[in-house]
């Protein structure tokens, strides 16, 4: 910095709150003539606690020894310490080396004021390298606290936040002309080179840092992806290489394996590739099964009978959302009709479309849990105590069709539903008792439509052919029309299911037709035990796995509850033995002898029906 003209110039710093900055005092600077000097190296400390500090200037070698004012200045303030403008120091800190143009109050007399008034940023060659030693080396230096500087210079220093420079120091330097060429061009270049490295870091305290996203934990049951063919080869060869070179690093082993893989024959590579393809197929299968298991994690279990009736608790929604295209409206206007229940033993192999009676069209599904007391031991042992009830429709009387059943689409990959005798008997007991408490536990697959107040018995005792009806007292009438299907009877319920309800009155007649053999034509087989009462006829489509759809008509009549049916027994007339599980005779006979006798009886009956007068002997 150069003071031209050799005149006595005064630097006035206003501020009554500190003795160094009082307005009454003026700092008398010595007359230096035309000499040029540079401020010694100053380093900029970014510590917010050192927001404002005094700058130490060393002017020992630059002072005029013949000046009389030099002695008084040294006696009063010390030769080594000269309090340079505080605003200038803060301007250096705030602007990254440039002076604060508006917040510095300087009264420069004579030629200095006229030369610098048009360009407020004063150009000073300040190599900022070591400011700490100059600041901390002199104990007599004082600092101004934050509030004083804010009130005096109009600076904002809140929260230790350093404002970014409004104008780059290069622009300030380039737009500020040096009045008397006091700064060397080399010094300016050095200053510009040092500025980018010395810029202070802008600290933003107002913004909150975003929390890092938590990665979802991997399910240990999820199948692992198969590795590549090269990875399989790496596993096989890594142990051998490690055995030969125990001190080899992983990088060295990788290089050796890579070279071995490159030199490997195509046929040997194909072996690893085939292993990878097989593992990939297994992975895709396991992944599909895993996803299906995740979508429908339903467990069916039986509960103990609760003698205390409780209020109906809301049932959970079905496993898969119902199709909105075919909603079945709920109906509660069936006081005189029996409940239509189809019992199924699969776990969760269908999607339920249930009558929408709740707010927002959400499906309301009533669960029916058959208690352990009503389940025979054969059910608990064979089916594991798992019972699934397919919800059927509740219909109004006088033949009004209410809606379609809430049976849903069974995917081809899902297991077909198998209707068993023991499950049907359990459903019959549940429907007859009508004293089931509201369910305590409600597994999703166990579903049934709301029950009407009448007591009814529903029995479907149809296993694979030959068709056999349950023994029932006369008040109960069951008519089943079912085409013969290859055993065992595996059926799908195909959407949209066709369900009709009609009301008929039948005369009190009893008809019976002989049982059909296994290879009989698909004629309707009817077993009737009727009474002159209203009949609820339910028609549903039952489709086997491979065969074409067949129609099953079930007519249910109102009447008194019927006792439980006996345990399954051999099909041959007169044999009371339970059937033996065998694929040769469709699990319907107890032995080979019963199979032969039954076939002989059926054949003799057929011959007798065609020619009553002839007598046929069969060996």
Swiss-Prot record:
GO CC list: chromatin; chromosome, telomeric region; nucleus; PTW/PP1 phosphatase complex
UniProt xrefs under Pfam families: HMG_box
Phosphoserine modifications at: 178, 182, 315, 531, 548, 550, 558, 560, 565
InterPro entries: HMG_box_dom, HMG_box_dom_sf, TOX_HMG-box_domain
Documented activity regulation: In liver, recruited to target gene promoters following treatment with dexamethasone and cAMP. Binding is decreased in presence of insulin.
Keywords: Chromosome, DNA-binding, Methylation, Nucleus, Phosphoprotein, Transcription, Transcription regulation
UniProt DNA-binding region: 223-291
Disrupted gene: phenotype observed: Conditional knockout in liver lead to no 10% reduction of glucose levels after 4 hours of fasting with an improvement of glucose tolerance and an increased insulin sensitivity. Conditional deletion in T-cells leads to impaired T-cell development in the thymus, due to impaired activation and proliferation of CD8 cells.
GO term, biological process aspect, one: RNA polymerase II promoter clearance
Major localisation: nucleus
Skewed-composition ranges (Basic and acidic residues): 183-193
Skewed-composition ranges (Basic residues): 208-218
This protein's record includes keyword Ubl conjugation: no
Superkingdom of source: Eukaryota
Chain segments carrying region Disordered: 155-227, 306-335
Gene Ontology molecular functions: DNA binding
Annotated SMART domains: HMG
Biased composition (Low complexity): 320-335
Role this protein plays: Transcription factor that modulates cell fate reprogramming from the somatic state to the pluripotent and neuronal fate. In liver, controls the expression of hormone-regulated gluconeogenic genes such as G6PC1 and PCK1. This regulation is independent of the insulin receptor activation. Also acts as a regulatory component of protein phosphatase 1 (PP1) complexes. Component of the PNUTS-PP1 protein phosphatase complex, a PP1 complex that regulates RNA polymerase II transcription pause-release.
Quaternary structure, from the entry: Component of the PNUTS-PP1 phosphatase complex, composed of PPP1R10/PNUTS, TOX4, WDR82 and PPP1CA or PPP1CB or PPP1CC. Interacts with PPP1R10/PNUTS. Interacts with FOXO1 and CREB1 (increased by cAMP); FOXO1 and CREB1 are required for full induction of TOX4-dependent activity and the interactions are inhibited by insulin.
Name of the protein in its database record: TOX high mobility group box family member 4
Organism annotation: Mus musculus (Mouse)
Phylogenetic lineage: Eukaryota, Metazoa, Chordata, Craniata, Vertebrata
């Amino acid at each position: 910095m150069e003071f031209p003209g050799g005149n006595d110039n005064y630097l006035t710093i206003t501020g009554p709150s500190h003795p160094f900055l009082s307005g009454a005092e003026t700092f008398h600077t010595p007359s230096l003539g035309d000499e040029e000097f540079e401020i010694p190296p100053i380093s900029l400390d970014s510590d917010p606690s050192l927001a404002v500090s005094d700058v130490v200037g060393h002017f020992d070698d630059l002072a005029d020894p013949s000046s009389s004012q030099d002695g008084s200045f040294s006696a009063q303030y010390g030769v080594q310490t000269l309090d340079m403008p505080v605003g200038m120091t803060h301007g250096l800190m705030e602007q990254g080396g440039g002076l604060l143009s508006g917040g510095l109050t300087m009264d420069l007399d004579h030629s200095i004021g006229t030369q610098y008034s048009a360009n407020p940023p004063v150009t000073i060659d300040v190599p900022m390298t070591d400011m700490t030693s100059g600041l901390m080396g002199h104990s007599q230096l004082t600092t101004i606290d934050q509030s004083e500087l804010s009130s005096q210079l109009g600076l904002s220093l809140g929260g230790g936040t350093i404002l970014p420079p409004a104008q780059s120091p290069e622009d300030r330097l380039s737009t500020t002309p040096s009045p008397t060429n006091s700064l060397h061009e080399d010094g300016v270049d050095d200053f510009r080179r040092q500025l980018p490295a010395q810029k202070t870091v802008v600290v933003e305290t107002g913004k909150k840092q975003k929390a890092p996203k938590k990665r979802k934990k991997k399910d240990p049951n999820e199948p692992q992806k198969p590795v590549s063919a090269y990875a399989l080869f790496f596993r096989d060869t890594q142990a051998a290489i490690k055995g030969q070179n125990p001190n080899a690093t992983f990088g060295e082993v990788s290089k050796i394996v890579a070279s071995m893989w490159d030199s490997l024959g195509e046929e040997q590579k194909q072996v690893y590739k085939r292993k990878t393809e097989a593992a990939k197929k297994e992975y895709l299968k396991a992944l599909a099964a895993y996803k299906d298991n995740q979508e429908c994690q339903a467990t069916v279990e039986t509960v103990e009978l609760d003698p205390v009736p409780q209020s109906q608790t809301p049932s959970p929604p079905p496993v898969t959302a119902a199709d909105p295209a075919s909603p079945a409206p709920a109906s509660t206007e069936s006081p005189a009709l029996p409940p239509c229940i189809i019992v199924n033993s699969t776990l969760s192999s269908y999607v339920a479309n249930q009558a929408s009676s709740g707010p927002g069209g959400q499906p309301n599904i009533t669960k029916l849990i058959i208690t352990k007391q009503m389940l025979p031991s054969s059910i608990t042992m064979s089916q594991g105590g798992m019972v699934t009830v397919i919800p059927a429709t509740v219909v109004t009387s006088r033949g009004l069709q209410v809606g379609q059943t809430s049976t849903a689409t069974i995917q081809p990959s899902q297991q077909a539903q198998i209707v068993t005798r023991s499950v049907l008997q359990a459903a019959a007991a549940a429907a007859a008792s009508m004293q089931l408490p509201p369910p305590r536990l409600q597994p999703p697959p166990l579903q049934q439509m709301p029950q009407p107040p009448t007591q009814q018995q529903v029995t479907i005792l149809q296993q694979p052919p030959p068709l056999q009806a349950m023994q029932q007292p006369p008040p109960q009438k069951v008519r089943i029309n079912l085409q013969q299907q290859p055993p065992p009877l595996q059926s799908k319920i195909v959407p949209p299911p066709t369900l009709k309800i009609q009301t008929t009155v039948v005369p009190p007649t009893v008809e019976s037709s002989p049982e059909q053999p296994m290879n009989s034509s698909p004629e309707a087989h009817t077993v009737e035990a009727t009474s002159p009462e209203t009949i609820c006829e339910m028609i549903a489509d039952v489709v086997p796995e491979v065969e074409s759809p067949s129609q099953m008509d079930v007519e249910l009549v109102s009447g008194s509850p019927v006792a439980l049916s006996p345990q399954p027994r051999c099909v041959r007339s007169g044999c009371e033995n339970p059937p033996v599980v065998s694929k040769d005779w469709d699990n319907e006979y107890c032995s080979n002898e019963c199979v032969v006798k039954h076939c002989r009886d059926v054949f003799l009956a057929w011959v007798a029906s065609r020619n009553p007068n002839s007598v046929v002997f069969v060996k």
